[in-house]
Each structure stands twice: as structure tokens, then as C-alpha cells.
Amino acid sequence: MSGHSKFANIAHKKAANDAAKGKIFTRLGKELMIAVKEGGPDVNNNSKLRQVVAKCKAANMPNDTIDRAIKKAASNDMSNYESVTYEGYGPNGTAIIVEALTDNRNRAASNIRSAFTKGGGNVGTPGCVSFMFDNKGQMIVDKEEYTGDADELMMLALDAGADDFNEEEDCYEILTSPEEFDAVNQALADAGVTFASAEVTMIPQTTVDLTSEDDIKKMNRILGLLDEDDDVQNVYHNWNEPEEDEE
């Protein structure tokens, strides 16, 4: 699942034990299926599918696994699955968006509401927190994987249509509009750049600090329960999570 900040995805994509990878691949497989359902199996004519494929490749999903998932989705009836988004609040007014892909809306709603409640939060009305986030294409390039010149990478990204380029201690972040994500991702991939993550995501405009141990425990409780929920695909939040608390 996606995290709170611009660079949180690196921790998830590097995670690494087989169980974590299996869970990530399962979620990505569902995203592939819903993208095929919505726009067909031809990646050249389905922009949503192209975005999910880029996300899969950044997560190191094998190409044959991606191809099998697309073919399976094209041959199966996915009409019983639907995408549902929930918005709500965690401790100290933190904003949380939950994207679910489920074949049972009632089950998903019940489990997600329970996760919020157990962490001292609550599910709100549609739109109650989404205005606090920007929908952006985001690519993270790990400095351990890319040893070239930062200025060259920046110019390559900007020339391809990126909106912004940020450098952190261990990675570079490239931001695009959702519409330009495909073009920028392809241009960088063609230049041999590999990604720690690459996806269209929700990025918080500002972040919230949690200073009390109780609030931190409650927030981790919410996020942990959502992470365990098979219906949940992505979680976005604006908690300025301390680095040592990331996995």
C-alpha cells in the first residue's frame, strides 16, 4: 500500500520477505484485473492498464506473471468486483484515504470502519479529506540503483513532461500529472532508469505530526488493520511518520 509521504513507497517496495512480496503481487494482480475490466486487455489502448503495469514492474513482478494476470482477467467475468473509496480521520485529525477492490461492499465497509474505530478514528463522508491530497504520477529512483548524474536525470524527466524533480538523501522523486505519467515513465525506462516505485498516487499537500505515544500507537493500529485487509488496495495518509517507524 502507498504511504503518507512523497518517499514512503521505497520502504514498501524494498520490503522484501516472500510473504510481503506475495501480498503485494496479489494486490497488484487485482489492480490488473480491474484495469482490464474497465478498459480491455490491450495495453496500447488502455492508459489505466499501462499505469498498473508500470507499477507492477517497479515492484519487480515478473513479466510472465503480469501477462498471465492480464490474460486471466480478459477471460474471466470481473463484474462482481468493484472499486470503493473511503475517507476518514485518524488521531489528531490525520487524514486517511482507503481504496478498496472488493466483491462484497458490505464486508469491506464493515472491516474498514472497524479499523478506524479500533484506532480511535472514524470514517467520514466522501470528499471530507481528499481535497487535502493531490493526484500525481510519482516515480521514485533509488540512488543505489541509479548512479548517473542527477542533473541529467532531472532534465530527462522534465523534457519528457514531468512537473517536478526532488532529491533526497537516498532517492530521487519525479512528479507528473496523471496524464503525463505514461510518457515520462516510458522515457525514463527507455533511458535505462529503474524505479523503486512508479504509480499514480495521492500525495498529501501538508503533513501532520503525531507527538504523543498514544496517538502514534492508534495510527499504527489503523494502518496495520487496513494492511491486513484483503479488500484494501491502497491507503494514503498525511501523517509525517517518523523514519524509524517505517518498515
Swiss-Prot record:
Gene3D superfamilies the UniProt entry points to: 1.10.10.200, 3.30.70.980
A GO CC term assigned to this protein in UniProt: cytosol
Protein family per UniProt: Belongs to the TACO1 family.
Organism: Lachnospira eligens (strain ATCC 27750 / DSM 3376 / VPI C15-48 / C15-B4) (Eubacterium eligens)
A biological process term (GO) from this entry: regulation of DNA-templated transcription
HAMAP family, alphabetized: Transcrip_reg_TACO1
Annotated S-S bridges: none
Pfam families, alphabetized: TACO1_YebC_N (PF20772), Transcrip_reg (PF01709)
UniProt-recorded name of the protein: Probable transcriptional regulatory protein EUBELI_00902
Location, primary (coarse class): cytoplasm
UniProt KW keywords: Cytoplasm, DNA-binding, Transcription, Transcription regulation
Coiled coil: none
Location(s), subcellular: Cytoplasm
GO terms for MF: DNA binding
